């Protein structure tokens, strides 16, 4: 309740500051916004609200696996088709190996941890420009409007309703240098304003920033660095498998290779979660 009041007060003060002291102009059209974010009502509708409605009304235009928009493909994008073929080849190799070694243990493939991913906005173009304003220019008011977008998206997706969301944990060095994390801001609004369940159960060790690495190095950079954290309510002897819900959503801002989502999903699966879905604002 106190956090909710603080968030509403912060929005009110941000808007007052924007109207009286430092008027904000729209990043795209130049009109005064009257709010604490650089988006006028028309551009907000076009860039934030309408893509959510389009995503909900046209699910067939997005990849059923990674959530990226399809160009000419059907059901799966080109990248996911290649991954599915690779996965099937690995399974075939494992079956042959099991026969030779008289062992029935299946090969655990990284992508098996994550059932599917939902995304809403393309990162390329205006989406990336807005995300950079939010993350790099410290315009934290964007968390409020993106939380509204996610809440609307979940409302239109029965598969995601009443499922706890697990925020992707930030690197400790990032919090130390920046002082805040956009995913935590987003989670606070979802939790306090829209009453959506948030489960902060993952922890991350320091490492290089993912955005500075090639696709090949992103997975190795995260190996062993994302894990379940033990909460105060857990006894030393208690198994984490008994407290995690069977179904969870991993919440992140951008999906590029899916490495971060997969390592988070792996940690949740190790804790006993049976089904993990990714939900990202942007696809790159």
Task: Please identify what each model-predicted range represents.
Residues 1-284:
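Glycine-rich phosphate/pyrophosphate-handling loop used in enzymes and phosphotransfer proteins
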């Amino acid at each position: 309740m106190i956090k909710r009041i603080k968030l509403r007060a912060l929005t009110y003060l941000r808007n007052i500051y924007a109207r009286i002291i430092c008027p904000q102009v729209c990043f795209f059209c130049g009109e005064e916004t009257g709010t604490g974010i650089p988006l006028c009502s028309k551009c907000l509708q076009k860039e934030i609200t309408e893509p959510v409605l389009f995503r909900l009304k046209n699910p067939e235009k997005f990849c059923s696996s990674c959530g990226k928009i399809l160009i000419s493909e059907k059901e799966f994008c080109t990248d996911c088709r290649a991954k599915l073929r690779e996965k099937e080849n690995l399974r075939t190799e494992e079956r042959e190996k099991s026969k030779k070694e008289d062992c029935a243990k299946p090969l655990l493939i990284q992508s098996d941890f994550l059932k599917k991913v939902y995304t809403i906005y393309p990162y390329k173009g205006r989406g990336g420009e807005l995300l950079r304003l939010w993350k790099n220019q410290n315009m934290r008011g964007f968390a409020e409007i993106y939380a509204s977008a996610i809440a609307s998206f979940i409302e239109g997706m029965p598969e995601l309703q009443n499922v706890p969301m697990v925020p992707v944990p930030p690197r400790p060095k990032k919090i130390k240098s920046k002082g805040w994390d956009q995913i935590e801001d987003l989670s606070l609004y979802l939790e306090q304003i829209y009453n959506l369940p948030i489960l902060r159960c993952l922890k991350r060790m320091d490492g290089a920033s993912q955005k500075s690495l090639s696709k090949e190095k992103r997975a190795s950079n995260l190996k062993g660095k994302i894990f379940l954290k033990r909460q105060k309510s857990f006894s030393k002897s208690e198994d984490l498998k008994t407290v995690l819900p069977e179904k969870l959503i991993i919440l992140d801002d951008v999906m590029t290779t899916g490495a971060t989502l997969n390592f988070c999903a792996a940690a949740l699966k190790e804790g006993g979660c049976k089904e993990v879905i990714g939900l990202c604002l942007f696809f790159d």
